[in-house]
């Protein structure tokens, strides 16, 4: 709990920006700011970590999602370290609910990468090589973090669900459990494993 305190995990949003469904996790309000109950934060963090460990132990793929600037580097680093897919740019509609199409685009990206590595781009006309190179870079930018995803994930981990609403909606629609940070402006009902913390203090 001390670690949570040191990173400022207890500071919520301004009281006027709160979601009433977060009331059970709020300890107090000071100077117009809601203060989260760190005892409950620590409890729910452990529950969420146990769920993630169980999913991983069962061989489930966990998709990490966090497009806000301060979340991008930690998400990419931790997901890569764990060998899991991630989304740190824009969430594209249908990334989960229309995964067949997304998988086709990932396959195209992999095919273009193979052609590039084989030196095919070097023997094309400059115009054609540039066209395919641009297409490859766009695919990498949009989907590069998802290259490990061969089927819909078994769990989704979201930083700031208030920003990643579409990701949570798609996961819920497919019955995929969602772990997510729950700041005081978040609707925790969209999370099977809410972690009540300040998601603006990513560490």
Model-derived regions: residue spans:
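N-terminal cationic and glycine-rich segments that engage phosphates or anionic surfaces
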Residues: 1-61, 67-68, 72-116, 126-133, ...
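Short glycine/threonine-rich loop/turn motifs
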Residues: 166-203
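A generic local structural motif
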Residues: 49-50, 140-146, 166
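Short gly/ser/thr-rich secondary-structure transition/capping motifs
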Residues: 136-143, 159
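Internal active-site segments that recognize and position negatively charged phosphoryl groups
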Residues: 154-172
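Conserved acidic residues
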Residues: 153-154, 192
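Short hydrophobic alpha-helical runs that function as membrane-insertion/retention elements
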Residues: 62-65, 85-88, 157, 177-182
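Active-site phosphate-binding and catalytic loops of NTP-dependent enzymes
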Residues: 11-13, 121, 141-149
């Amino acid at each position: 709990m001390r670690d949570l305190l040191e990173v400022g995990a207890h500071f919520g949003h301004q009281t006027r920006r709160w979601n009433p469904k977060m009331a059970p996790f709020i300890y107090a309000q000071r100077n117009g700011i809601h203060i989260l109950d760190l005892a409950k934060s620590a409890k729910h963090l452990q529950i969420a970590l146990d769920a993630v460990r169980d999913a991983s132990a069962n061989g489930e793929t966990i998709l990490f999602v966090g497009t806000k600037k301060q979340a991008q580097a930690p998400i990419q680093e931790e997901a890569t370290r764990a060998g899991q897919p991630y989304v740190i740019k824009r969430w594209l509609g249908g990334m989960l609910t229309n995964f067949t199409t997304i998988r086709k685009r990932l396959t195209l990206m992999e095919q273009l990468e193979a052609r590039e590595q084989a030196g095919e781009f070097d023997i094309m006309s400059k115009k054609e090589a540039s066209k395919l190179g641009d297409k490859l870079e766009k695919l990498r930018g949009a989907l590069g973090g998802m290259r490990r995803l061969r089927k819909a994930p078994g769990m989704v981990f979201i930083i700031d669900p208030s920003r990643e609403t579409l990701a949570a909606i798609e996961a819920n629609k497919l019955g995929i459990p969602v772990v997510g940070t729950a700041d005081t402006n978040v609707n925790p009902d969209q999370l099977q494993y809410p972690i009540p913390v300040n998601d603006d203090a990513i560490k």
